């Protein structure tokens, strides 16, 4: 597998391509007495390249019969092409060893006998050469005594160029990449889809050859070869693969897992499994093929592979658009393969599945087949058990029910495929799910005939309502029959599959939502679902009532049995699903548009659904969803998408779909209530939607469906409600347990995945919901703008409050229509929420999901009660969750504790007072009405606030409005109109997280919580410190003391400065105060706790208001999670209070999250901090995310800093990176980012980022989406021109079906760091080449104007080289401020972990001052803003390397007070100045850098050069021209290689060349250390990505990886600077020598000169002119760069001035608050 790090190491190097030819002459082999070789083969190999000689006989010798030889009478030549690399300043190529292996070939098997390595670099040269070699090989077998090989090795240089040139890449190396993520069909060229859509597609699918085509489409195919086997083939060789029925079930689980980790590989594996598994279905496939009907769909089962779409040859696909896709999907994929393939399919299904449905299995096949395959496997297995016959039987397209019944196997698999492929389809089915779901069989029947056209539509990404119904129709009748089968299969190892099948069967038999959920579930473990689906299809003939009843009965059984299985299976699957969901998201997106249409039609149909049928479908859905909660979350998106069709499609790529679902679910609930109040039609539609959504979400699956049905039916289906309630109770309890378990996994997955919001099953669903929410937000905002926003905000802001109070009102209304149902719904939702809650800690994306799941969280509370159906169970579940929470996040737990106790108390009271179901339902209803009211009001904040106050959660509600504003401001900037909702949702997620954590973890009693809260609030008011201490104490109780301490320490270190401020804030105004407390307390949960508790207690109004703000801040934090950056934003925010609060709260929240994670890994806290900062910065990247003022500032500050508020700092998590990418590409045509692989394949996303920051570099609107190579080339060339290390080549995106995830992530990490100005700058290298000191980036936040260079330098020196991290001078100035600053810088710097670690490392070497710089280096640019980099010499003296100073004083690097230029610019400026000085003969040493003189010190030139010529403190600037050269390293870059302090003196006497050599040596040592660690990290990271085993560890490694990459790039930049120095120095030296000689010549009289002398003089003059021109060119470049840098400085100064004023206002306000 190609090494990302090796590519990074090649940046800036030279490459030479050689052709080596080995000519074998003789092989001598001596063996033991008991053995002699048969045939010998000489293999020349490296990695995955093998060049073998022909097999030759071994002839024993006459003298020694055991010593034989192989002699080539005619020399045999083998040739290889090798690319060798070298540093530009070194002639020797880097080592590259190829191995000669002697192998014995016997009976077709080969055994290695001996090997020897040959370093080709030793035989490479510019001149062709032949070298005779006699190599002595090392025996690798006990049978070999001695081996020698004689050959001639010749090497010829083919071409030379830069290591990053396209033609220098090794194709073999490229192709050795193993894609580690599943691709979304949406992201692939549409030509594939068109092929699949072709009328003959179904037939083609039937043909075996097409599988090859698919394979060509996807490199992964090779891995999936077995899976690709046609159905017949699969049947033929079932033994070779896993057993059809049992294996499939077991297989799917692993595939899912693999899928999560590396979508493609697992998919491939699954495919292999599929073939064997398919054997059972194969018989039916033949029928299917002959019949060409839905039943035929099963035939494709053998060929579930995407590549093997041909397998899907199941003509059955043609039978109906829906069925066909399913068929190809189902039959082709075995259970196992479907699991993995599903993931792929999920991603790709959206586009390809839809398009290829009818005949698309070639493309869709891969993804669909995977998803469908698993299901189909399950279905097939079941079919084999009993429904097989029906599956085999052909069904009429017209009677989809009969089709489903007769060919349920085929169709159910088909449906599953569709489900996986199309969340929209799932939605349709869900609507239709009950079969009576309102899409009557008639609609389906009608659709069935139309299936082919529909499939075509699907291909286009549009799904007709009819289509959905046809898919949905299949399985109503046989659930009972097949339940037995399913159960039987489960023991066979299909437990997972069973759970999934359960969900799927309900999905098929029930409604689109169910199927959607089941589809997702199916992707995780669709086998069972498929099985069930078949049975339900089989009974499709039965009356709806019968079917409904049977479905309920069977499902309840399944739910009971499966629910138990599912919890674990789902959990395991969840992780797997985590990966699948990404794909599903895309699918969902594509299918969403279709689903929207389908949903609309389905909504009508659903309205028409019979109560019983609805009930049945709902109960089925509920059970299925309960089992599949993790997976179900995704289907939820489908229904949601109904409303926002456009959004669904647009946001399909992202997790927006999920958001929409959540939003829709909430909206539906709200609307349902509102409709109940005011709009019956809307209520029905939304009820249906929520029905689908909830069902899919698995939150209130049965209850929601029921209530939805009731709503659709005019709230007139109490019967169904009752039934649903019962079924729900059964499934819900088990499901809850499952969910409780799942949350952990989800949390880990989400956290690890980060970008992998999708990876978390339920959380994933939630992330999708979040995405949908955004989409829906737009759609829904249009219809219910206020409602959604307010509601979401309410949910997000005051989840606890809303949970406690709103749930009642919500439930009350719902109770009328869906009393029993809602209870169940809430329970399910609660489960999902639990997962979600766990997830939010982990990933911003998850947080979004949580936000979307805020409603779910509320439901969770109700659910806690309702699921408490056995109250004990619910409480236990809560306790478990609480434990998990506490483990995952101490801080969060504490925070949650306070509200939780309240919530618990409320919930318990409600539960105890009323039947759990009723109470919960009432709560939910109450919530809904309240939310609705708020949303309808538009400003609903007052209402919410009032209600919240009533419930003691007023504060939270109040906060909600604030949050809305803030969120809308922040997110509005970032994501546009969608952002507010997203933020709200994020907030919701965050609050939810905290609340749920509180509920589960603390399980504190309301009284205790209130007391704690009151104490906390009082403490905060009393004293910031006291408050902080108390908060910490509170946190400690909530969390283990060590953890709390660790959190505190980490955050304290990171946020110490801010914490001081925050303390004041906390003490002063609780809004800011609590924020600060949260933020700084390491969010010791107490602050958050206070926040929540404050809201709960309602505390005094002031605290309440503060609480809301706090909450808002916390929410904002949650929103951006990333908002960690909001610290900077705080500074940048126009409204200092809110913004600062937000900023602090965000940091606090991050701390909490970090703490949560920290329980698992204390590092997590730091990570959270980094993530926060990063996310914040990322969000900031949206540009002015903060209030308008801040928005203005940000643009001013730096175009490259989208979120310049709090400079993004370095990327800390894959999720934050993914979100940043989504944010900056938002609104670009054809760009839909859902992952780090296929979303980037066509190059449009890269081009969009380039265009976003550098519109002049590329004409985005002229790009052709189908011209993959050219698009990528333009983007890569553009970034390379800007200085971004080129890790990717167009070939990477073209040759690999799924681009390498790690390479793409690494490249994007570099792009983000560059575009946001957060690149690390090398500040100083330790003499021994030990750890170097780095600083975050461009110093974009340059020194505030208020800090003049002199003042700053002086202060830094005084404080041990402390550098003000932020413009907050007051804090920095504080005596204790320095350490705080350093730690805070570290926090800001993006990788809190990294920063802290670095600080720790360098603190010692650099001394306290070093600590400051260290922090600075790792800190956000805020500190760098000063632009001064203080290097601390061994002496410990502080040197402000940064501003060197006057142009004359070459020694000091150009002052970059504003740090706007990158360190590279500094170097350039230095060189330029030096050049000028030299030109002017001004080599005089300008020591000018007395430490104090820094401010004015540098000579006039210094002042001129930089606004703040912070001359490096005198330690640095030893006079002497030499110093000029050392300064060559721009201050930001690195100071002299040796410790600047001590060596400064030496440097003045050193020659520039000596200085450069010493620095280069130190750089090499530093690089060696980084390279060693990077190799380990990459190896571990790839292993974890492929296995998906430990998401938490993966995320930790990703953060470390990003840090290493940033350090490596800093070293590369510094090396480039040194190279320029060397060139300039060389020019100077030559100029000096030429000038001296020329002067000597000119001293001779003209008449005395000989002809030779005259000629020599002419040559000297020409050379001199040439040198001058070259130097001028260098100077021109430097001038250009410097001018740009100065312009940036001016712009930054204005922004910093505003920020400074803001900060001062904030500080004064905090002081007042503290006093008060």
Swiss-Prot record:
Post-translational events: Prenylated. Farnelysation (predominant) and geranylgeranylation has been observed in vitro.
Ranges in a coiled coil: 1005-1033, 1558-1707
UniProt feature, compositional bias: Pro residues: 1516-1533
Cell compartments where the protein resides: Endosome; Recycling endosome
Biased composition range(s): Basic and acidic residues: 351-380, 394-403, 413-432, 479-490, 542-560
Any one of the GO CC terms: recycling endosome
PTM sites of type Phosphothreonine: 278, 448
Compositional bias annotation for Low complexity: 1491-1509
Chain spans, region Interaction with BIN1 and AMPH: 1399-1549
Role, per record: May act as Rab effector protein and play a role in vesicle trafficking. Involved in apical-directed transport in polarized epithelial cells; the functions seems to implicate Rab8, BIN1 and possibly DNM1.
Oligomeric and partner information: Interacts with RAB8A, RAB8B, RAB10, RAB13 and RAB15 (in their GTP-bound forms); at least in case of RAB8A can bind 2 molecules of RAB8A simultaneously. Interacts with BIN1 and AMPH. Interacts with DNM1.
Protein name stated in the entry: EH domain-binding protein 1-like protein 1
């Amino acid at each position: 597998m190609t090494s990302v790090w090796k590519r990074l190491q090649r940046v800036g190097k030279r490459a030479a391509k050689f052709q080596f030819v080995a000519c074998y002459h003789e092989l001598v082999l001596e063996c033991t007495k008991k053995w002699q070789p048969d045939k010998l083969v000489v293999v020349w190999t490296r990695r995955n390249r093998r060049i073998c000689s022909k097999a030759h006989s071994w002839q024993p010798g006459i003298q020694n019969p055991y010593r034989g030889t192989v002699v080539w009478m005619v020399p045999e030549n083998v040739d290889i092409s090798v690319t060798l690399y070298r540093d530009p300043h070194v002639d020797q190529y880097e080592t590259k060893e190829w191995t000669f292996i002697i192998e014995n070939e016997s009976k077709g098997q080969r055994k290695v006998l001996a090997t020897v390595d040959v370093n080709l670099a030793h035989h490479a040269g510019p001149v062709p050469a032949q070298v005779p070699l006699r190599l002595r090989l090392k025996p690798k077998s006990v049978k070999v005594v001695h081996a020698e090989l004689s050959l001639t090795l010749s090497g010829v240089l083919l071409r030379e160029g830069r290591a990053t040139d396209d033609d220098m890449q090794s194709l073999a190396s490229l192709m050795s990449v193993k894609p580690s993520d599943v691709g979304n069909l949406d992201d692939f060229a549409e030509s594939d889809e068109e092929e699949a859509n072709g009328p003959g597609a179904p037939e083609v699918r039937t043909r075996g050859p097409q599988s090859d085509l698919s394979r060509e489409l996807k490199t992964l195919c090779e891995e999936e070869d077995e899976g690709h086997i046609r159905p017949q083939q699969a049947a033929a060789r079932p033994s070779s693969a896993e057993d059809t029925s049992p294996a499939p079930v077991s297989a799917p689980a692993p595939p899912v897992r693999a899928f999560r980790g590396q979508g493609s590989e697992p998919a491939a594996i699954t495919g292999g499994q599929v073939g064997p598994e398919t054997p059972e279905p194969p018989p039916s496939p033949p029928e299917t093929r002959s019949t060409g009907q839905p039943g035929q769909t099963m035939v494709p089962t053998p060929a579930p592979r995407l590549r093997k779409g041909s397998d899907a040859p199941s003509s059955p696909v043609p039978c109906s658009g829906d069925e066909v896709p399913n068929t190809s999907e189902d039959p082709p994929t075995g259970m196992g393969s479907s699991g993995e393939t599903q993931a792929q399919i999920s991603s790709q299904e959206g586009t390809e599945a839809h398009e290829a449905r009818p005949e698309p299995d070639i493309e869709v096949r891969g993804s669909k087949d995977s998803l469908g395959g698993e299901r189909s496997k399950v279905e097939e297995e079941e079919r084999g058990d009993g429904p097989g016959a029906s599956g085999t039987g052909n069904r009429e397209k017209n009677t989809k029910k009969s089709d489903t019944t007769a060919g349920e196997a085929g169709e159910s698999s088909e449906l599953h495929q569709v489900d996986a492929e199309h969340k929209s389809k799932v939605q349709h089915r869900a609507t239709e799910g009950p079969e009576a779901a309102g899409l009557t069989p008639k609609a389906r029947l009608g659709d069935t005939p139309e299936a082919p056209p529909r499939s075509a539509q699907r291909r286009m990404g549009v799904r007709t309502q009819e289509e959905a119904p046809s898919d949905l129709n299949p399985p109503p009748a046989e659930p009972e029959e097949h339940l037995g089968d399913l159960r039987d299969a489960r023991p066979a190892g299909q437990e997972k599959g069973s759970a999934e099948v359960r969900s799927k069967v309900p999905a098929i038999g029930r409604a689109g939502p169910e199927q959607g959920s089941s589809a997702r579930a199916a992707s995780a473990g669709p086998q069972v679902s498929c099985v069930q689906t078949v049975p339900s299809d089989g009974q499709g003939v039965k009356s709806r009532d019968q079917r409904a009843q049977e479905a309920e009965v069977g499902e309840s059984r399944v739910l009971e049995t499966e629910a138990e299985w599912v919890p674990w299976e789902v959990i395991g699957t969840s992780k797997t699903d985590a990966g699948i969901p990404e794909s599903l998201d895309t699918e969902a997106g594509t299918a969403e548009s279709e689903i929207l249409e389908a949903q609309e039609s389905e909504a009508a149909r659903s309205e028409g659904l019979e109560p019983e049928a609805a009930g049945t479908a709902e109960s089925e859905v509920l059970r299925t969803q309960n089992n599949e909660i993790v997976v179900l979350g995704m289907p939820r998106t489908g229904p949601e998408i109904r409303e926002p069709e456009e959004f669904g499609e647009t946001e399909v790529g992202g997790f927006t779909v999920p958001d929409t679902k959540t939003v829709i679910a909430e909206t539906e609930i709200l609307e349902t209530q509102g409709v109940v109040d005011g709009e019956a039609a809307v209520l029905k539609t939304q009820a249906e939607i929520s029905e689908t959504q909830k069902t899919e979400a698995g939150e209130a699956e049965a209850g929601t469906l029921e209530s939805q049905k009731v709503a659709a039916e005019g709230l007139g289906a109490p019967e169904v409600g009752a039934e649903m309630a019962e079924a729900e109770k059964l499934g819900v309890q088990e499901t809850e347990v499952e969910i409780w378990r799942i949350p952990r996994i989800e949390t880990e997955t989400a956290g690890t995945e980060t970008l992998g919001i999708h990876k978390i099953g339920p959380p994933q669903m939630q992330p999708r919901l979040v995405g949908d929410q955004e989409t829906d937000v737009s759609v829904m905002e249009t219809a219910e703008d206020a409602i959604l926003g307010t509601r979401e905000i309410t949910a997000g802001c005051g989840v606890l409050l809303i949970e406690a109070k709103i749930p009642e009102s919500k439930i009350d209304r719902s109770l009328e229509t869906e009393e029993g149902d809602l209870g169940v719904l809430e329970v399910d939702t609660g489960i999902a929420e639990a997962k979600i809650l766990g997830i939010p800690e982990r990933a911003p994306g998850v947080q979004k999901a949580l936000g979307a799941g805020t409603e779910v969280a509320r439901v969770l509370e109700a659910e806690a009660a309702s699921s408490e159906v056995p109250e004990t169970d619910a409480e236990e579940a809560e306790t478990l969750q609480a434990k998990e929470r506490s483990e995952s996040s101490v801080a969060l737990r504490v925070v949650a504790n306070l509200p939780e106790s309240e919530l618990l108390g409320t919930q318990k009271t409600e539960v105890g007072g009323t039947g759990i179901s009723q109470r919960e339902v009432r709560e939910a209803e109450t919530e809904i009405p309240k939310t609705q009211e708020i949303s309808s009001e538009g400003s609903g904040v007052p209402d919410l606030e009032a209600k919240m106050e009533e419930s003691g959660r007023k504060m939270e509600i109040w906060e909600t409005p604030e949050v809305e504003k803030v969120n809308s401001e922040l997110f509005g900037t970032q994501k546009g109109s969608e952002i507010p909702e997203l933020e709200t949702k994020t907030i919701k997620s965050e609050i939810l997280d905290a609340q749920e954590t509180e509920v589960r973890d603390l399980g504190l009693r309301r009284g205790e919580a209130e007391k704690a809260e009151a104490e906390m609030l009082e403490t905060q008011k009393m004293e910031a410190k006291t408050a902080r201490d108390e908060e910490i104490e509170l946190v400690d109780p909530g969390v283990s003391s060590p953890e709390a301490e660790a959190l505190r320490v980490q955050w304290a270190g990171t946020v110490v400065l801010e914490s001081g401020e925050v303390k004041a804030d906390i003490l002063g105004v609780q809004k800011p105060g609590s924020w600060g407390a949260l933020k700084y307390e390491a969010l010791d949960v107490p602050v958050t706790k206070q926040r929540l508790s404050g809201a709960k207690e309602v505390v005094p109004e002031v605290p309440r208001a503060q609480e809301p703000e706090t909450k808002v801040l916390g929410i904002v934090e949650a929103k951006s999670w990333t908002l960690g950056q909001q610290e900077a934003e705080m500074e940048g925010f126009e409204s200092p209070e809110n913004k600062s609060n937000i900023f602090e709260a965000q940091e606090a929240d991050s701390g909490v999250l970090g703490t949560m994670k920290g329980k698992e890994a204390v590092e997590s806290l730091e990570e959270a901090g980094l993530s926060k900062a990063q996310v914040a910065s990322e969000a900031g990247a949206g540009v002015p995310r903060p209030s308008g003022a801040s928005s203005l500032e940000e643009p001013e500050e730096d175009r490259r800093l989208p979120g310049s508020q709090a400079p993004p700092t370095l990327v800390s998590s894959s999720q934050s990176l993914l979100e940043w990418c989504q944010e900056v590409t938002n609104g670009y045509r054809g760009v839909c980012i859902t992952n780090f692989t296929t979303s980037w394949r066509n190059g449009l996303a890269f081009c969009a980022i380039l265009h976003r920051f550098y519109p002049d570099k590329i004409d985005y609107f002229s790009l052709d989406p189908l011209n993959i190579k050219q698009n990528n080339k333009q983007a890569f060339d553009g970034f390379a021109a800007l200085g971004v290390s080129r890790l990717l080549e167009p070939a990477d995106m073209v040759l690999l079906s799924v681009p390498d995830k790690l390479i793409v992530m690494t490249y994007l990490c570099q792009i983000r760091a560059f575009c946001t100005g957060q690149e690390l700058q090398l500040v100083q290298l330790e003499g021994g080449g030990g750890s170097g000191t780095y600083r975050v980036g461009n110093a974009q936040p340059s020194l505030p104007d208020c800090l003049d260079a002199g003042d700053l330098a002086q202060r830094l020196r005084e404080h041990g080289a402390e550098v003000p991290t932020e413009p907050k001078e007051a804090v920095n100035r504080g005596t204790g401020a320095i350490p705080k600053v350093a730690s805070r810088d570290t926090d800001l710097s993006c990788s809190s972990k990294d920063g802290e670690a670095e600080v720790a490392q360098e603190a010692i070497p650099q001394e306290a001052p070093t600590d400051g710089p260290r922090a600075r280096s790792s800190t956000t640019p805020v500190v760098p803003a000063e632009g001064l980099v203080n290097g601390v010499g061994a002496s410990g003296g502080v040197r402000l390397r940064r501003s060197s100073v006057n142009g004359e004083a070459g020694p000091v690097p150009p002052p970059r007070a504003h740090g706007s230029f990158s360190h590279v610019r500094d170097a350039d400026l230095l060189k330029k100045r030096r050049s000028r000085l030299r030109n002017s003969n001004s080599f005089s040493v300008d020591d000018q850098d007395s430490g104090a003189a820094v401010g004015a010190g540098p000579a006039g030139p210094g002042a001129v050069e930089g606004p703040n010529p912070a001359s490096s403190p005198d330690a640095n600037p030893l006079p002497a021209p030499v110093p000029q050269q050392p300064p060559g390293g721009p201050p930001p870059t690195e100071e002299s290689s040796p410790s600047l302090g001590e060596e400064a003196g030496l440097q003045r006497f050193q020659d520039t060349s000596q200085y450069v050599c010493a620095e280069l040596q130190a750089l090499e040592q530093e690089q060696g250390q980084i390279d060693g660690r990077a190799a380990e990290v990459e190896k571990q990271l790839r292993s974890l990505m492929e296995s998906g085993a430990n998401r938490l560890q993966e995320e930790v490694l990703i953060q470390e990886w990003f840090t290493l990459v940033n350090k490596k790039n800093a070293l590369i930049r510094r090396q480039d600077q040194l190279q320029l120095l060397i060139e300039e120095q060389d020019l100077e030296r030559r100029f000096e020598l030429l000038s001296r000689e020329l002067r000597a010549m000119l001293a001779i009289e003209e008449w005395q000169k000989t002809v030779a002398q005259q000629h020599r003089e002419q040559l000297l003059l020409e050379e001199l002119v040439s040198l001058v021109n070259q130097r001028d060119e260098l100077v021109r470049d430097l001038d250009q760069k410097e001018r740009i840098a100065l312009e940036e400085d001016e712009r930054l100064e204005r922004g910093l001035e505003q920020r400074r004023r803001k900060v001062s206002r904030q500080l004064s306000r905090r002081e007042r608050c503290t006093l008060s």
